[in-house]
Every structure is written in C-alpha cells, then in structure tokens.
A protein has these predicted regions:
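An N-terminal hydrophobic leader/cap segment in hydrolases
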Residues: 1-31, 38-43
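Active-site glycine-rich loops that stabilize anionic/oxyanionic intermediates
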Residues: 49, 57-60
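Conserved alpha/beta-hydrolase
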Residues: 62, 69-95
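Alpha/beta-hydrolase active-site loop
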Residues: 100-121
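Alpha/beta-hydrolase-fold enzymes
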Residues: 142-231
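Short beta-strand/loop motif that positions the catalytic acidic residue
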Residues: 259, 265-267, 271
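Short alpha-helix in the alpha/beta-hydrolase fold that links the catalytic acid
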Residues: 261, 275-284
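Catalytic histidine-centered segment of alpha/beta-hydrolase-like enzymes
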Residues: 297-311
Length: 321
C-alpha cells in the first residue's frame, strides 16, 4: 500500500494519486426519477476481490474521496460512488447553489438502492462481495439502506455516521422553529437555508472545520474554490427537518432489528457535528455491530494525518477481508 504522507501532500496527490484514480475512472448518470439525473463515478481496480459502494456526507461529493478511493483501489476493491441529490453534479431540487435541500430523506436511500441494483450489479456486472462505506449523512443513508434492504451488501462500514445531530439549542426546539419557518409561503420556505447564505466563503477556516489534517483540508478547499459544483455549504429548512426524522428512524428498535450483516462503526472522539450518543445507541441495538472510537479526532476520520489515517484504513480493510 502506498500511503500519502503530509510532507509533500499536495504534490503527491497531484502527481501520483489523481492520475492513478483518473486512469481507472468511468463516469455516468442515472435517473431513478425522470428528469432528475444522479451523477456517479466508478473506479476499477487492476485486480478486484470485491466492490465498495461509497456514500458521501452532507455538502460533499465524490471528489472529496479521491485519496480514499486510491487506498480502496490498491486494497483490491472496485469503488462506486454517487453524488447524492442536491450535491456535486447531481440534480438540485432548489435554486440556491450553496444550499442542500431534501424533499424526502428517503430519496437518498432509494437512489442508493437503485444505483447499487441497476448500475453496480446489472450494468457493471459486479457479482462478487459487495460492501458499503458511508460517512456522516452517507452513514445515515447507509444505515437506513441496510435496514430496508438487508441482503444488498455483505458488510457495512459507517464512519462518523449521522445518527443524531448536534444543535446549538435542544433538538425539539430546533424542529419546532424550523417547522414554523417551513410553513411560511405555503410551505415554499422549506427550501430556504436555515442560516442565510448567498456565496461561498473563499477564506479557509481549518480550525473550525471537520478535519484533523490541515494539508488535506486545504487541498480539498482549493478544489472547492475552483469548482462551483462543490460549493454547497448550508442545509435548507426542509433538509434539517428530514435529517432529524431520518436519524430517529435509523436508530429505532424496529429498524435496527432488521440489520443482518456485520457493521463496523468508526466513531470520532471529538465530533462536533454529530452526537455520538446516537451511534452508541445504534451499536447497542445491532448485535453484529463493532464500535471503534478514534480518540481526539474530529468528524471526518478520512481527513486525518497519516499516523491516525493509516490505522483507520487498516482496520477497515481487515474488517472487509
């Protein structure tokens, strides 16, 4: 395994990782709902022993996972990743390019199942072991997916999954306030941002980011500066309401009881974005779930320095087998 270190990170990403991944990339779109194109990328390993479906987090895109895909390919996995609706190059259900809106959180789940069934399995003819890797919002989507479609994947990795949210006020108060706002203008205000946003902030702010690795944060921030498709920053009122409901559903006794596959839950010890209590409850309710905490790290565990990142990936690959 060729690990990318911090000393020459940007240079190594541009000279080694990007060309390697690009040479193995196939891009495409699909429409589960007519007129709503979902963008995806397939990355084909030189010698694959299985395949990973990658489900990214809130305001992210497939482009944020180039380094992660590089390691997955080297480990012998084909990788299939979508830009979830409202993100990246996929269909946007609202006009503000900086705001992520969701009519129904379940649409993410239905998209992911359709993508796995129709693109990964049928079109790309993946017949070997199929695994799920879901980060944050993508982890909540993943949890819902393996509850609803328990035989779709062989194993699942949920990394800092969004199973309970952190708000500056108690969740019931936030939900009540957002619901009142959302009812304005005949419900049209659900597409408006929870906090006003009309531009992408062009000044990096590593200290308040979700990352523990500065070079990785700056590398992707530079990508976002140059690509308007990567500049989503804020949730809509509707997204916030749907996310709260999705978290509650995903950790419920009724739904967690449906999970039949092994799950590895990687938990960030210093997560300021999601409430780890939701992850703890989920893990306690899923007999086949192994919870592994990475002490002191912020939300995005795949964006840590190599002294943490290498053991993180080694644990994941050992789990997948």
């Amino acid at each position: 395994m060729n690990w990318i270190r911090e000393a020459n990170y940007k240079e190594d990403m541009e000279a080694v990782v990007e060309p390697y991944v690009a040479a193995r990339t196939e891009a495409g779109t699909f429409e589960r709902i007519k007129g709503q194109k979902i963008y995806y990328e397939a990355y084909i390993a030189d010698k694959a022993k299985g395949a990973i479906v990658l489900s990214h987090g809130f305001t992210e895109s497939v482009r944020k996972f180039t380094e992660s895909v590089y390691y997955m390919l080297q480990a012998g996995y084909n990788v299939y990743a979508v830009d979830h609706r409202g993100h990246g190059r996929s269909y946007r259900p609202n006009d503000n390019p900086y705001v992520v809106h969701a009519e129904k959180f379940e649409d993410y789940v239905l998209d992911l199942e359709y993508f796995t069934r129709e693109i990964v399995k049928r079109e790309k003819k993946e017949t070997g072991p199929l695994y799920l890797y879901g980060h944050s919002m993508g982890g909540c989507i993943g949890a819902w997916t393996i509850e609803t479609y328990p035989d779709l994947f062989k194993k699942a990795v949920l990394t800092s999954p969004m199973l309970a949210l952190k708000f500056p006020v108690p969740t019931p108060i936030m939900v009540a306030g957002a619901s009142i706002i959302g009812m304005g203008k005949g419900g049209r205000r659900k597409k408006e941002p929870l906090s006003p946003v009309n531009a992408f902030t062009e000044t990096p702010d590593f200290e308040n980011s979700c990352d523990s690795s500065k070079c990785r944060y700056l590398y992707y921030f530079d990508k976002r500066l140059k690509d308007s498709a990567l500049q989503t920053t804020s949730p809509s009122v509707g997204w916030g309401l749907e996310a709260v409901k999705a978290c509650k559903r995903a950790i419920s006794k009724e739904e967690t009881a449906k999970i039949r596959i092994p799950v590895l839950l990687m938990q960030a010890g210093n997560d300021t974005m999601v409430d780890n209590a939701g992850q703890n409850l989920f893990a306690s309710r899923v007999p086949g779930c192994t919870l592994a905490q990475v002490p002191g790290m912020k939300h995005e565990l795949y964006m840590t320095d190599s002294d943490v990142l290498i053991p993180y990936w080694e644990k994941i690959f050992a789990f997948l087998g």
